[in-house]
Every structure is written in C-alpha cells, then in structure tokens.
C-alpha cells in the first residue's frame, strides 16, 4: 500500500497584477481576479457541501454547533440529516447565508456563492436570522456550542447581534472581506443596515472583523475549503491565501516595501511506502522584496511534522488500510 503526498498551492499567476497595490486599488484589482465565478444552482449546494464542509470523520462541519478539539453536542450526516422542518436545535442542517440573503435581495450570483454559504443547524440559523455578527454583551439566547444572540455595546455600535464562537470568528471575518471585495461595484439595490452599506463594511464592522481576523488566524480547515470551492466555482478567497491583504485594504500594510506576497514552493508530489521518513521541501520559496520568510506547514490529521516552521520538515509516513492521499500546505508570511 502507498501513501500519496500532495502539495496544495495557489495556481501560478492567479494574483498577477496586485504587486504594490493597497487600499481601494488592491480591492478593485482582487475584485477583477475573483469576479465572474462559475454559478451553481441553490439545490446543488447540498452536494457541494460534501466537498467543502466535511469533517475528518465524514460528518457535516457546522460552525454553529462544532466544538474544535472537543466533543460537539451533536453532529449531522450528509443527505439524511438535511432540513426539512425543525422544531429545535439538533434536528437537521440547512444552508446558511452568512451574509444574509435579505441584504442583497436574494439575487444571483450571491445567493449560491459557496464562499459565504455554509451548512449549519437549522434552528440556530433561524435564531441568527439576519442579524449582523458582533460581540454580545447581554445574552438573550445561547446555542449548545456557545454561539449566542443578544445586544452589543462596543466598537461604537449598539444593537442586536449574533456571535459565533471564538474559534470560527476569523473564518467569518475573512468571508465578509471576500464578499465586500467580490461584489464591490456590483451591489446596486443591496441593503444598507447596521453592518453594511451595499457591499461596503461600516467602520465599526471593519474594526471588529480585523480583530477577529487577527485573533483567529487561517486554519487548515479554511485552506482546504478554499481549494475545494476553487475546484467548484473557479475563484478563491484572497484573504485566506494572503491574510495580510485585509490590513492592506482596510487598515495599513505592515510592510513598507509594498504588499507583494511571497511565492510558496511546497516541492513535488510524492508516492511513498508506509513508515517511510518523508521530507517536505520549501526551499524553492521566495520573496520579491527579499524579506525573511516565516514557514508554517499544515499537515492532515494524524500526521505529526517534526517542525512545521522549518523550511523542510519531515514526518513518518502513516500506516493505511488502503492507498491514501494526504495534502500538505506551505503557508508563508
């Protein structure tokens, strides 16, 4: 039996044309890159979720019920647990527009864009309603995983909000940065409400989402989901690929030399035997501005890298029942 080691990378040249840009110029350049994605039907989302939101145990990855590194109060099986009707939490899962569809009048292509559509518990989805995300000060309702609804009084905003758990706040922040970029200049007729004006985020929302983005960095889950959605829609979430771009657009770039992202090289795909020592190879990575590179390799569950911050870490190939494929990602800063 063999183990296939596959290196996930951003398609070469995908972000050409972004060199040296920041602010609104960068946002518009990214808009042109991720615009005009392949649009799928609303009913097809049930099938696509099986590629984009599957846990390692093959259950539905529901961010409104999951407890990372813990035991979720309940889990859903794809297809058989689709809503339907529900009378309470843990009955079934449905399709959550994290950017509520009423904010864009349920128009296409936003209503089926997988970058903001995720499977969630139907009842919790209903309790979230179309309230903005925020940080609850006075709680009126709490889900079984700790997501909550209530009133917010911070970031110069006071009103009813829905707060996901800390472990997924960065995910939703990067989703909102994507939506604000993908649909800028295409938001005619969109809603203005407490959090957004069309596709533009209001000042308090930018401040909060940047804090969420920084406190909950990009995870392996997001990296894998970004690749899965790219395979389906043909576009990517730039703020997962290059997290610094959120600051470059809505705040300030940390680098004084521009915002040209480093080029990651993860080495070739490999096919190895069980229990072999395998070396990853990031030596071909480079930075146009000659900045020092910080490596962070992400490995699939069950594989322990000897040093994930090394340019070329190693690991022992796992024992497998059948030939299996494992995806590794080289994330550079």
Predicted features and spans:
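N-terminal module-boundary/linker segments of secreted carbohydrate-active enzymes
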Residues: 6-70, 249
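Surface-exposed, proline-enriched loop/turn segments that connect beta strands in immunoglobulin-like
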Residues: 265-269, 299-300
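Short beta-strand segments of immunoglobulin-like
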Residues: 267-273, 284
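Acidic, Ser/Thr
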Residues: 281-289
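Solvent-exposed loop segments of extracellular immunoglobulin-like
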Residues: 288-296
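Surface-exposed, flexible coil segments in extracellular/virion-facing regions
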Residues: 295-316
